[in-house]
């Protein structure tokens, strides 16, 4: 189980990212549209003034049961060992253990 403070910090980052998502996206599009370098610098300053944690690269994909940040499977939203346990207990429909 991950520390609760880390999980809360990640949730706070997700909220910030949602809040600034449109602003960051429109600024980046505007950079490519504006031909003058001086105007581009103004837009860059505007982008850099947004909070650091509002960038999507600061987010971690975490297991929604344990909060573990590593070995996550996107399709299920689970970490590897929880996924394995759930497949063995037949709790995930359509998932089978491989055997060869």
Curated annotation (Swiss-Prot):
The keyword Transmembrane helix does not apply. Gene3D superfamilies: 1.10.287.1480. It holds the Pfam family Ribosomal_S14. GO terms for cellular component: plastid; small ribosomal subunit. InterPro entries: Ribosomal_uS14, Ribosomal_uS14_bac/plastid, Ribosomal_uS14_CS. One of its GO terms (molecular function) is rRNA binding. Its main location: plastid. Part of the 30S ribosomal subunit. Belongs to the universal ribosomal protein uS14 family. This is Small ribosomal subunit protein uS14c. The lineage of its organism: Eukaryota, Viridiplantae, Streptophyta, Embryophyta, Tracheophyta.
């Amino acid at each position: 189980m991950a520390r609760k403070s880390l999980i809360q910090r990640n949730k706070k980052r997700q909220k910030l990212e949602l809040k600034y998502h449109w602003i960051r996206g429109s600024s980046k599009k505007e950079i490519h549209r504006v031909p003058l370098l001086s105007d581009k610098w103004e837009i860059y300053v505007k982008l850099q003034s947004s909070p650091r944690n509002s960038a999507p690269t600061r987010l971690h994909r975490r297991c929604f049961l344990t909060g573990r940040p590593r070995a996550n499977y996107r399709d299920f939203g689970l970490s590897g060992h929880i996924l394995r346990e759930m497949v063995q207990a037949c709790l995930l429909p359509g998932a089978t253990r491989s055997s060869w």
